[in-house]
């Protein structure tokens, strides 16, 4: 995963700036409630900010640190070198998006929708993504480490080279013809055997 391209000295902002191109700012404890469809955000850091009723279209080199998102949409969004760290992202819409070199770390994201998205060189690290949907997604060089993936849906998504061995995957829903190449631990393998309709007797 490529490193963020953020200046070491960012201009401090105490409120949102209404510009079409927002670059090289750090926002702290700011509440943002507006449509950001026509705004390109580049090289910024958001710390302990709240986003409500927002939608994004293009994000590059951004850190969201301890932020809360309510009714926020990243549908059909391009995210490049974006880090979500210790954020509350439950219910967020990421469908039909392109994510490159993007990090989700220590986030709570129940029932997120990633359907139809493409992930390239992304990292999911110690997140709770219970009930989220990864339907018809495309993964390239993407990792999941110590994530809670219980009751997630992966229909029509190739799981080749995805490593779930350190994750919780209880009640995961997948397409049986897309399992080739997935990496799981021995106990998880039994769950996948059940998904295939195979009965195991001791």
Describe every region a protein language model picked out.
Residues 2-202:
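Tandem repeat scaffolds
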């Amino acid at each position: 995963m490529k490193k963020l391209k953020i200046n070491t000295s960012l201009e401090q902002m105490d409120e949102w700036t209404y510009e079409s191109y927002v670059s090289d700012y750090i926002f702290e404890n700011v509440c943002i409630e507006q449509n950001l469809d026509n705004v390109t955000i580049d090289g910024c850091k958001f710390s302990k900010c709240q986003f409500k009723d927002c939608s994004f279209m293009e994000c590059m080199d951004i850190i969201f640190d301890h932020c809360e998102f309510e009714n926020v949409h990243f549908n059909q969004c391009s995210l490049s070198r974006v880090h979500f760290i210790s954020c509350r992202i439950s219910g967020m819409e990421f469908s039909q998006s392109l994510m490159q070199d993007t990090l989700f770390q220590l986030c709570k994201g129940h029932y997120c929708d990633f359907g139809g998205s493409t992930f390239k060189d992304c990292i999911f690290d110690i997140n709770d993504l219970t009930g989220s949907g990864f339907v018809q997604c495309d993964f390239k060089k993407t990792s999941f480490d110590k994530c809670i993936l219980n009751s997630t849906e992966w229909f029509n998504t190739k799981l080749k080279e995805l490593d779930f061995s350190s994750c919780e995957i209880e009640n995961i829903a997948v397409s049986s013809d897309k399992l080739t190449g997935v990496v799981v631990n021995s106990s998880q393998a039994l769950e996948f055997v059940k998904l295939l309709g195979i009965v195991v007797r001791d």
